[in-house]
């Protein structure tokens, strides 16, 4: 599930895997739900994958372009079901 860089996350550009603080651009999963652009699984940021706030979040939360806004609650544009 790593997207760009290190597998388990943390600070920096392109953190990859499940945990870590999730700061930075292109985080993979970000289980601690922090700020960042392009987070994979959770947290705030642009293009987050699974939940949390952000533009283009994948599974839930608030944001423009959520895939499944009703899955976790919240709202967004362009919901996929």
UniProtKB/Swiss-Prot annotation:
A cellular component term from Gene Ontology for this protein is: cytosol
Q: Which UniProt keywords apply?
A: Keratin, Repeat
Instruction: Briefly state the protein's biological role.
Output: In the hair cortex, hair keratin intermediate filaments are embedded in an interfilamentous matrix, consisting of hair keratin-associated proteins (KRTAP), which are essential for the formation of a rigid and resistant hair shaft through their extensive disulfide bond cross-linking with abundant cysteine residues of hair keratins. The matrix proteins include the high-sulfur and high-glycine-tyrosine keratins.
| Family (UniProt) | Belongs to the KRTAP type 19 family.
Q: Self-association or partners: how does it assemble?
A: Interacts with hair keratins.
Quote the PANTHER family the UniProt record gives. KERATIN-ASSOCIATED PROTEIN 19-3, KERATIN-ASSOCIATED PROTEIN 19-3-RELATED
- Protein name according to UniProt: Keratin-associated protein 19-3
The encoding gene: KRTAP19-3
């Amino acid at each position: 599930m790593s997207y760009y860089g290190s597998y388990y996350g943390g600070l920096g550009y392109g953190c990859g895997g499940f945990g870590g603080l999730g700061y930075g651009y292109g985080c993979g999963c970000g289980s601690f739900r922090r700020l960042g652009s392009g987070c994979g699984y959770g947290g705030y940021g642009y293009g987050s994958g699974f939940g949390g706030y952000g533009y283009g979040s994948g599974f839930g939360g608030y944001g423009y372009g959520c895939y499944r806004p009703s899955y976790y609650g919240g709202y967004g544009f362009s919901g996929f079901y």
